[in-house]
Amino acid sequence: MERSLYERLGGMDSITAVVENFRDRVAADDRINKKFARTDLVRLRKMLIDQVCEATGGPCQYTGRSMKVAHEGMGVTSGEFDALVQDLVATFDHFNVGQKEQGEVLAVLGPLKTEIVELDSSQVGTPLPAAYEVASALAR
């Protein structure tokens, strides 16, 4: 029996390391970081870890908002979504994640594009609309 994608990725410690590196990579990427200017990075970290863990067959349960609701009003372009995917692939490469596993993760996350992208444009680096309401911070 083949191990789950979660297990092949290295479990919770590996997923956490990948998410933290990815979050930092996105924060440094001028093509997309304006969309995260008002984001609670602690919340983002937790939500991403839970989402990736659950999506790959791990024991976590993602309890955040749907991708459509979470990104509604952000004005995310196709170009910005593609830049985010490029950052994710670069993160996977940094951690020597195998091509098979990368493909499986991208196959799970790729369909979310239609829920996240609001503008069919190759433009990147667009600001977060002033009217966008960010999620509340996690209780600490």
What residues fall within each predicted segment?
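Core of compact, soluble alpha-helical bundle domains
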Residues: 1-140
